[in-house]
Amino acid sequence: MGKQIFNTAVICFTLTLIGLSLGFVLLKIQGDE
């Protein structure tokens, strides 16, 4: 049970990092135009 919670936390953390990275890249692309 504890391992499942840990896996869920890791997945959420990874998705958050990916979302922040994508958002940053999109802002950078829009700013360059």
From Swiss-Prot:
Molecular function in Gene Ontology: electron transfer activity
GO BP: photosynthesis
Entries under InterPro entries matching the protein: PetM_cyt_b6/f_cplx_su7 (IPR012595)
GO annotations of cellular component type: cyanelle thylakoid membrane; cytochrome b6f complex
UniProt topology in membrane: Single-pass membrane protein
Record Pfam families: PetM
UniProtKB keywords: Cyanelle, Electron transport, Membrane, Photosynthesis, Plastid, Thylakoid, Transmembrane, Transmembrane helix, Transport
Transmembrane segments: 9-29
Family per similarity comment: Belongs to the PetM family.
HAMAP family from the UniProt entry: Cytb6_f_PetM
Known role: Component of the cytochrome b6-f complex, which mediates electron transfer between photosystem II (PSII) and photosystem I (PSI), cyclic electron flow around PSI, and state transitions.
Name assigned to this protein: Cytochrome b6-f complex subunit 7
